[in-house]
Every structure is written in structure tokens, then in C-alpha cells.
Amino acid sequence: MEYFLGDNPFFGVNHRVGSKNLADQGERFDKACSVIIESINHGFSGFMLSSHTEGKALVDKATKHLAERNLQLRLALVIPYPHTINDLVASHGYVGGLKRLLGSTRAGFIYDLTRLLFMSRTALRKSLITSYIQAEKASFENDFVTVDSFCLHNVFTDMFLGLRRFDLIIEFIECCDAIGVTPVIISQNPVLAMSLVTKIPHVVCFSYNTLGYMVNPSLDSVNQAIIENGLESHKKLWAMQILASGNLSLEAVIPYTSDASVST
């Protein structure tokens, strides 16, 4: 059983009552850093974080606390976050933004751009996905922070599942595997997400709790899919919303998720 810290409380996100007014960032991040340090001290496996600018600011601040205590933080980074690419284009233009995604030097950019022109559509997509993942990884990592998992945002996962473009999700899994990070597929349709056909080790992350809150399409069908997934040793399961937005106690939740063979 692994436990991961989630970032929603640090940014005022609550799926039951919606977003709430936030305290000053300095005060909020001080408290968040304390929680992050405590999660490491209590054996949490990592921290799932969205790749937006505030997420980066939180990691930068947490790094100072980590350095003081000589601790290491493992990140599971949720991508894509559109504003990251928007910021690149706004700051550097289309060509400049592409250059920063593909290569840090002029010669490297020319080489990468030339290579893209002669790629197949699938190869082109995978090259861009890989470059984007590598850029995000480099942005968040430092001596005390390692990004060892990349999580495909459920908006994109579920859109691809709905369109039956399973190939796009598998390409994401392949790109992560190629650069040595764990691919995580976040979905609100876990039954379909667990049915993806690939032998590459990956994680399926979904809402799961005893109340059936935000569990789709139903708690019974997800339970059955979890049982069937037990035969797929290369697929791990992570559960979100285990407290059902505060409607369940931690004491009530842990035995249930442990029996279900999912990490939280």
C-alpha cells in the first residue's frame, strides 16, 4: 500500500462545495510546506501536483524546507496544463516557445525541427509529447525534488476514451516509459481506462470510496474491474476521493482501500 499527498487543499479545490477563497499565498504555502514535510516523515510515497505556475512556486518554496532537513520529495506531476504552453508562446512567440520545448541550443532546435518535418504523424506526436514531458520534468526538478511519475489529466484521458482514441493514451504511456518515468492515467471512467491493452507498466488513477461519491459508472462495476485488474500485474491502481470530500473518516477508509488493492 502506498499513500500520496494531493494538492487540491493547497489551492482551494473541494469537489463537494467548489473552490473557496484563498488565504495569502505566503501563509498558505507555509502551511502547505509543513504538510509536505510531515507527509514525508510519515512515509508517504509522493506528492501529486498540477503543473501550473502556483504549483511550481509551491515546489520552489518547499525545496528550502527540504534542503534544511535533507529530505527528498517525489512528485507525480499532472499534465498537460495549458497555461504552461500559453506562457511559453506569450513570452517567446511560437518559434521561441517551440525551441524551448525541443532544444536549448540553436543547433539543437534546427536539428529537432528538421527531424519533425520528416516524421510520420504518430512519430511527430510522440516527439512533441516526449519533449513536453522532459521540459516539465526539468522545470520542477532540483537536488531535493524528483519527478518520477507523469499523470495524464482526466479531462484529456476521458476525452480520448470517449472518442475511442485509445492510441493517444497508449502513446502517452510509451513516451513516459521511454524516458524512465511512470505513466499515470487519471480517469473518471476507470472501468474503460483499466481495459487499455498495453504491456507497458502504468498506473490507473480514479475516484474510489465506500459511498460511491464521484465513482463512475458505479461502485459495483468499479469493484468488479478492480478484481479483474488483479490479474494484470503490470497495472497499478491509485484511488482519489477516498474521504468523499470529507464525508468519510480516515479510520473507516484505510481497511476498505487496503482490501481493494489500491494505493491512495
Regions picked out by a protein language model, each given a short descriptive name:
Residues F29-I36, N41-G46, S50-E54, A67-L163:
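Active-site beta->alpha loop and helix N-cap motifs at the rims of alpha/beta catalytic domains
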Residues M1-E68, V253-Y256:
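N-terminal binding-site loop/beta-alpha segment at the start of enzyme catalytic domains
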Residues L58-V78, V181, K235:
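Short acidic, glycine/proline-enriched helix-loop-strand junctions
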Residues L22-I36, H52-A62, R125-S139, R164-F172, ...:
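Well-ordered, non-membrane alpha-helical segments in soluble/globular domains
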Residues F4, G46-M48, C151, C205, ...:
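Conserved beta-strand positions in the central sheet of alpha/beta enzyme cores
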Residues G12-D24, F47, S120-S127, C205-V215, ...:
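Acidic/glycine-enriched edge-of-secondary-structure segments
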Residues S19, E141-F144, D148, V155-T264:
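Beta/alpha (TIM)-barrel catalytic core signal, keyed to glycine-rich beta->alpha loops juxtaposed to Asp/Glu
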Residues L5, L75-L77, I185, A239:
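Structural beta-sheet core signal
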